[in-house]
């Protein structure tokens, strides 16, 4: 029997009485986001809206973005990816379970040095899927656009991982699963974490280094395997 979404007590700043909100809304207030389902327009719009709000509320505190998703729409994934690049704050992306297809694309789009995986998580790279069906004319037009988007995504993967675009194209032609070590070597992530407390240390390192003009990727990459 499903237990539903748990509710927890939360007191809105300035209010004297606590109210009960679902656990995800409570975590949003702590700048923690979850992608735990198929990525469609509705889910993407919710995530984008929360990121815009958190960035406008405080552009000095980072966002932690947990991912356990089979992926989804190319347009939705590109929207979330673009927002991560657009906002001022750092976005730490964390794979737990599985980040497949466009979910792995979002994982790779996190702030450099802050793209993480738990030890038993997996990422999966493959060719993003497009829609089909309808009249022949529109199917041809859609096919051209799908090919354009796939090529765009391949180039962005290459940019985020440092892999040659030719290798990205080949690897996207089949389901390509990777454990943390392989994902790090490939460039999809920067670091494997074994305990959630490591996030605090990582955030402190990044915050300290930003005061000197940037994140020391070499130092962060040496932490873990």
UniProtKB/Swiss-Prot annotation:
Alphabetical UniProt keywords: Chloroplast, Hydrolase, Plastid, Protease, Serine protease
Q: Which CDD domains match?
A: S14_ClpP_2 (cd07017)
GO MF entries: ATP-dependent peptidase activity; ATPase binding; serine-type endopeptidase activity
Q: Which domain of life is it from?
A: Eukaryota
Q: Where is the active site?
A: 101, 126
Residues spanning the membrane: none
Disulfide feature: none
Gene3D superfamilies assigned: 2-enoyl-CoA Hydratase, Chain A, domain 1
Which GO cellular component terms are attached?
Answer: chloroplast stroma; endopeptidase Clp complex
Name the SUPFAM superfamilies for this protein: ClpP/crotonase
Query: Could you say which EC number(s) this protein's record lists?
Result: 3.4.21.92
Q: Which GO terms describe its biological process?
A: protein quality control for misfolded or incompletely synthesized proteins
> Where does this chain mainly localize?
plastid
Specify one Pfam family. CLP_protease
Enzyme's top EC category: hydrolase
Catalyses which reaction(s):
Hydrolysis of proteins to small peptides in the presence of ATP and magnesium. alpha-casein is the usual test substrate. In the absence of ATP, only oligopeptides shorter than five residues are hydrolyzed (such as succinyl-Leu-Tyr-|-NHMec, and Leu-Tyr-Leu-|-Tyr-Trp, in which cleavage of the -Tyr-|-Leu- and -Tyr-|-Trp bonds also occurs)
Compartments it resides in? Plastid, Chloroplast stroma
Quaternary form?
Answer: Component of the chloroplastic Clp protease core complex.
Task performed by this protein: Cleaves peptides in various proteins in a process that requires ATP hydrolysis. Has a chymotrypsin-like activity. Plays a major role in the degradation of misfolded proteins.
Similarity comment: family membership: Belongs to the peptidase S14 family.
Name by which UniProt lists this protein:
ATP-dependent Clp protease proteolytic subunit
What organism does the UniProt record list as the source? Chlorokybus atmophyticus
Gene name, per UniProt, is: clpP
